[in-house]
C-alpha cells in the first residue's frame, strides 16, 4: 500500500493564531475551523493546527526542548520575506547555514526561509 500525505499537524496553544500566521506566510486559505482545530490549504495536502493542552514550545537549538516539526519555505526575496514573517510574529533564530535563515513561529516551532 502506498499512502498519501494529507496533513502536517502542529500542536500549539492557540491554533487560530498559528493558522493565521501560516495562512498569511504561505498565501493559503483557511479551509476548516472546528473548535480547536484549523486547516489551511485547498489542495490534497494541508497544514493543520490543533490545541494541545500544556503545550511546551520547542526552543531550538536547545536539546532540552527539541523541535517537533520543521518547515523549509522557499522565497525569492529574503529581505521582503523576513520583514513579512517578523511582522506576522516570527522570531529570528541563530542560523549559520548559507541560503537559510531560521525563525520561530508564534508557537515556537522553528522554520527556515531558503533562497537562491
Where are these regions (language model features)?
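Short, surface-exposed ligand-recognition loops at beta-strand->loop->(often short) alpha-helix junctions
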Residues: 9-14, 74-75
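Vicinal oxygen chelate
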Residues: 2-6, 28-72, 83-106, 116
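Amphipathic alpha-helical segments
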Residues: 14-29, 81, 85-87
Amino acid at each position: 500500500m502506498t499512502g498519501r500525505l494529507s496533513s502536517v499537524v502542529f500542536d500549539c496553544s492557540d491554533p487560530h493564531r498559528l493558522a493565521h500566521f501560516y495562512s498569511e506566510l504561505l498565501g493559503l486559505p483557511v479551509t476548516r475551523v472546528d473548535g480547536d482545530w484549523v486547516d489551511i490549504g485547498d489542495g490534497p495536502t494541508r497544514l493543520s493546527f490543533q490545541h494541545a493542552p500544556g503545550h511546551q514550545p520547542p526552543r531550538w537549538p536547545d536539546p532540552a526542548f527539541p523541535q517537533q516539526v520543521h518547515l523549509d519555505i522557499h522565497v525569492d526575496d529574503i529581505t521582503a520575506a523576513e520583514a513579512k514573517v517578523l511582522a506576522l510574529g516570527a522570531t529570528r533564530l541563530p542560523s549559520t547555514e548559507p541560503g537559510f535563515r531560521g525563525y520561530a513561529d508564534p508557537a515556537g516551532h522553528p522554520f527556515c526561509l531558503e533562497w537562491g
